[in-house]
Amino acid sequence: MAINLSTIGVRLYYGVEVTAGERPTSGYTRIFGIKSTPSLNPAPDTIETTTLDELEYKTYVDGLKDLGGALEFTFNLTEELITRWDALMTAYETAKASGLRMWFAIVVPGLTKAFYFAGNPSSMGLPETSVNTVLEITNYITPVSAPVKADKTAEMTDSVSL
């Protein structure tokens, strides 16, 4: 029987390739304060193949999937997030200058595998503010690879630190 899972304890990590083109298998750093992650499960485009022989329905074949450009990750804006995102951006710029990519991992407690994708993060800006609300920010990561499921690394254990 399947065990239903909760979003409690979902975590976001980043790591830099050691060898160009290969997802890192260790050395990931956690980013705290995540409130929401985007869907990495887009519907494929459909390509119409209907001919004049069809009398009632159009026909299609699957096309490419589109993650939609820059992915939105929502965080509580804290001094710790600013420090960690600045460190992430420094690591990204260093990796980019060396011809290496940055990888991101979304870890769900209770699943044996994590969800990985290579991406280019954007610098953090100033979020919208309004009266009597939690200060949140949306940070952006543009995917440069298809998402993959793979085993969690050692630093991605299911223990949830509060």
Please place each PLM-identified region on the residue numbering:
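Short beta-strand and beta-hairpin "edge-sheet" elements
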Residues: 106-150
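Residue-level detection of beta-strand scaffold positions
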Residues: 69-71, 100-102, 143-145
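A short, polar/proline- and glycine-enriched secondary-structure boundary/capping micro-motif
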Residues: 24-25, 84-85, 161-162
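Intrinsically disordered, low-complexity terminal/linker regions enriched in Pro/Ser/Gly
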Residues: 151-162
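Solvent-exposed edge beta-strands and adjacent loop segments
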Residues: 2-77, 120-135
